[in-house]
Amino acid sequence: SGDMTSKDRSLLYYYNFETGLYTYSDIELNNLILKVEYRAQVGTFKNVVEIIKTLVPLKEQLQDRNLIPVENGIFNLKTKELEPFSDDYIITSKIATAYNPNAKKPHYFDVDGWFSSLACNDDEIVTLLWEMINEAINSNYTRKKIGFLVGASGNNGKGTYQMLLVNLIGKKNVSTLKPNEFSEKFKTAQIIGKVCNIGDDIGDAYLDDISNLMSIATGDGITVEEKGQKAFSIYTRAFCLFSGNSLPRARNKTGWIRRMLIIPFNADFSGTVENSDIKEKFVSDKNVLEYVLFRALNLEFEQFSKSKAVEEALREYNKHNDYTQAYIEDAYIPNEYHLLEKVPLIFIRRDIKRYFEEEGLKQHLPYGFGNEFAIRLSKTTKDVYKLKKGRIKIDEMEQFPSWTVSEVNTKVPIYLIVKE
């Protein structure tokens, strides 16, 4: 496993007949070497491992989206049958819950009703809660999304939903990285061999580098490094799911927005009699987990379902993550500047800086801001705006705040946002 083009940058795995998995463990390999040669020294371990790596073939990890390893075998999504484990399949992890073809919803806990309460009776959100479980248990396939459970209330159920997922998949199969940790040198290695990553209590701190997180979402390779070891490449399609009261902003705005799946958790159970059995008992109950796994495995969908609430949450996030867009929607359009045929770019620059100051933001306008602003304004209003050089008359300046008169030279051509 690792870089499929280089043994030097790949890890050495061995097949465990008891679990049906290929395992990567320096300690276990050393124990196997000692069983053959009890006099082996520390230096011997490394030499033997290097010899084995040289001799054994380099094989790709199982990447068939239709084969999902569960506790008691490999579930085939096409045939809906459970197949036995085999050393022919290069599998490094499996779901901790067994597949039960006769699984039924337990009479003592209505999972569907609970999901509905989490979603505030929004059927579209309920569907997405099930689809995210399907995505989380299949590390051989990615729908190229990063999940975010967001809710301002501290008692909205998102933590309990995550607990259900962790119990379903198994703690040892879940890494717990937060978004910012994917850019830290030695942290990303934690995702090796994991089925899913679930990070909770994330903050709204700015994410300067999201390249690793984006690569995992799309199934591309990332370079990882463990302390004292050489860097190597891995390919993982582990679903990354995060939760928090707010969302982090990111540099790569367009690509980042395209990958985000924001699920609003707007329920508030603070004023109700909380059923403590849900968190303490039901989400770890064997029958509940087998029913949830059965339902999730039998879902069929290519892309995540559409949801009005999700689209609205994404639109709101996009506005707050993109301060230029926020200025257009919160200040420029409400002041009806978009209705004017000509708006001096120097005015927009000054006005947007004022807006940033009022919002407590420290932002610098990028090179090429004028063209970018015209494009954003066109998309938002559905009209056409261009950045052009031309003159603006004194009487046209009366439509702007008084301070603008001293800033704009009406005698020479200047840059304008022109409505066509």
Roles of regions detected by a PLM:
Residues 1-10, 35-420:
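Feature primarily recognizes SF3-like P-loop helicase cores of small DNA viruses
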